[in-house]
Amino acid sequence: METENAIYVHLKGPDEFGHDGDAIGKMKNIEEIDERFFGTLLKNIDTNKVAVMISADHSTPCINKGHSDDPVPVLISGDRIENDGSKRFTEEFAKKGEIGLLEGAQVVDKAIEIIKLGN
């Protein structure tokens, strides 16, 4: 990726709401991150030149109030990256996404592959 640029964002905030079992709080936190952080970020980068990857280190479903082995949502976005049709950024939709199920150590390599294919 010598000529590629990418930004990786690790989401931690929603995890706390998962531990509290607060699904509404978790959803609102993700919406706030989307509006305040990503809204600002996307206004200030050239998405034709920069890809953005969003993920976390584990799933924390509200129903469990703890960490689980559910898939962790991963979003990779940029003008040159094709949408896989996923409509929501959730553990459930992560199971159905085009990226598939990966081990944690495979995520960055898969992201680089997807970004390069977008060229």
Regions found by a protein language model. Give the residues of each.
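Feature captures the catalytic ectodomains and active-site-proximal regions of enzymes
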Residues: M1-N119
